[in-house]
Regions:
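Beta-propeller-forming repeat regions
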Residues: 1-269
C-alpha cells in the first residue's frame, strides 16, 4: 500500500503479506513498513524472474539511481539494480508516470520502459532490456523524448505483428491526438526465405524463426518523434460530439484503454 499526505514529498510504503494456513484459508500478517519513496510511485516488477514482486523506484533517503525493493524472507530490502548505460543521465521518474515492465525486444523477457522527468514540464523515456544470463541486470537500449502534453502511456500490439507498441494521448493547444509508436522488429521467416531442405538462405533478410519466437532483436526500432502515428481525436469521432475534459479532479491522468471490444481480433481504443 502506498500512502501520501497532502503536504508530504514522500510516499509511505506498507506491506501486508498473505499468510496461507494448512486448511487453505488466507489471512494478512501485520504490516511491515518499507523505506519511503519519493512521490513518483514505485513500479512493480519481477526483476529476477522468480515470480516474486519487487518494487523499482526512488528511495526518499537515497541518491537518484533507481534502487530495488527486493523480497528477502518476510520483508523487502533496498539494493542497487545493475543498470549498464552509455553515460546517459539516470532516469528521474516523472510524477506521475506510466512506466512499465514489458518486453520491448521480443526475447520473452520483460524489459523496463521508464518515463522520465526531462525538466521544464517535458517527458522523456528510456528502454532498458533485461539480460537472460544475469537476473536484475539491464542494458540501456533506447532513449527519446515524448511530445509536449503527453498523457499516460499504454502498451499493446496495435498492428498484430507480435511486438508491443506504445499508445498515448497528447494535447497541443486546443487539439488532442492519439499517438502510436510502433515497435518494429525482424519479421517471421516466410517459407520462401528458406533454402533447400529447410536450410536458411544466407542472402535472405534478417527474420525470426517460427520455432524460435523468443530470439531477441536488439536492433528493434521504436518509431518516435516525426515517425509517430498521430490520429486527431476529432477525426475519430466524426460528427459525434466528444467532450474533452483536462481537469477531472484526479491527480493521476487517465490512460487510453486498449482491448478487443467487438471481438474481431484487432485492438480497439
Amino acid at each position: 500500500v502506498m500512502a501520501e499526505r497532502p503536504t508530504s514529498t514522500t510516499l509511505s510504503l506498507y506491506l501486508w503479506a498473505a499468510v496461507v494456513a494448512h486448511d487453505g484459508t488466507t489471512t494478512l500478517a501485520p504490516p511491515i513498513t518499507l523505506p519511503a519513496s519519493t512521490r513518483a510511485h514505485p513500479l512493480t516488477i519481477d526483476a529476477t524472474g522468480a515470480l516474486a514482486a519487487d518494487l523499482l523506484g526512488h528511495v526518499a533517503s537515497a541518491p537518484p539511481p533507481l534502487p530495488l525493493w527486493h523480497a528477502a524472507q518476510d520483508s523487502l530490502v533496498t539494493e542497487p539494480l545493475a543498470m549498464h548505460g552509455d553515460g546517459t543521465p539516470p532516469c528521474q521518474l516523472a510524477h506521475p508516470h506510466s512506466s512499465a515492465h514489458v518486453d520491448m525486444n521480443g526475447d520473452c523477457l520483460a524489459d523496463l520502459f521508464l518515463v522520465c522527468d526531462a525538466g521544464r514540464g517535458r517527458l522523456s523515456y528510456q528502454v532498458w532490456t533485461a539480460r537472460r544470463d544475469a537476473p536484475r541486470t539491464y542494458d540501456l537500449a533506447r532513449v527519446g523524448d515524448l511530445p509536449p502534453g503527453t498523457g499516460a502511456l499504454s502498451f499493446a500490439d496495435m498492428n498484430r505483428d507480435g511486438t508491443i507498441d506504445v499508445v498515448f494521448p497528447a494535447c497541443e493547444r486546443d487539439r488532442c491526438y492519439i499517438h502510436i509508436a510502433y515497435n518494429e522488429q525482424m519479421p517471421l521467416c516466410a517459407p520462401e526465405r528458406r533454402g533447400v531442405w529447410g536450410a536458411r538462405n544466407a542472402s535472405a533478410e534478417r527474420c525470426r524463426d517460427a520455432a524460435q519466437l523468443c530470439a531477441p532483436d536488439d536492433a528493434f526500432v521504436l518509431r518516435d518523434g516525426a515517425d509517430l502515428v498521430r490520429i486527431p481525436i476529432d477525426a475519430l469521432t466524426s460528427d459525434r460530439r466528444l467532450l474533452l475534459v483536462d481537469d477531472i479532479g484526479a491527480s493521476q491522468p487517465v490512460p487510453v484503454r486498449v482491448g478487443d471490444y467487438n471481438l474481431d481480433g484487432y485492438p480497439d481504443l
